């Protein structure tokens, strides 16, 4: 089966499974799991932060970060396309009583600086207290421009705001930019990093930041049900991914470019963008459902919408992409 729906569908490889089965474990709620402790320390060092905290999901690590930065009645500024606003069930509002202030993203995924500045509310009992700027990198596959990140985080600091980066795919951004991940993490007070996407682990996210912030997030992790016991078996997969699956993300980026080039040869398809491991393209609305079914019958899983996303990952080869493009061509040729 060729699965282009997301990089979350990656499966652990036999060497990763071997690392998991050999993991030394303890009770992580007691702080006794040596493999979890090693993962947290390793990622903190790699990102240039003081401490790290292991979570079962990126949604939970983002939520704990927001709740660590903001109190009830506070507000965070965020892009309308951001995962922390659009795709996490409104958790910040539902569970943290934190109000989002969504702003329109520019074409490159950034939030215009003048819009950020204008959205910061004055200190007044009538308003929610603006406390945090939350960005995402990559966003829609796009790497945020480094100068933009520097300017946006500087603006936030000057106005008394903390900063959080949803870095679910920050290693994709680092590989694409040719920079160490610490350079992308440095401007932010906290960063969440996901291991169950392009890095290929079955589960896991780590939040990094200052020791004081992580201490607060640790309590919120417990409240949110994220405290786990002998979870070193999962942390071992993340450590394996850090050692073996980061540099190979460049292959996914090259495969995405190859996929986009193939779709561009099909008259009925309108390319929108390709960046890192994501390709966005438009298909005629009336063909989306039948094309998705056609592809599934041929062993290809997609989510065909008017504006469709295709995501490359370690379980998709160059030959798989050629098979997919040929199948799309075959579908339109038969009509």
Question: Where is each model-derived feature located?
Answer:
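Conserved PLP-enzyme active-site core in the AAT-like
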Residues: 2-293, 298-316, 324-331, 335
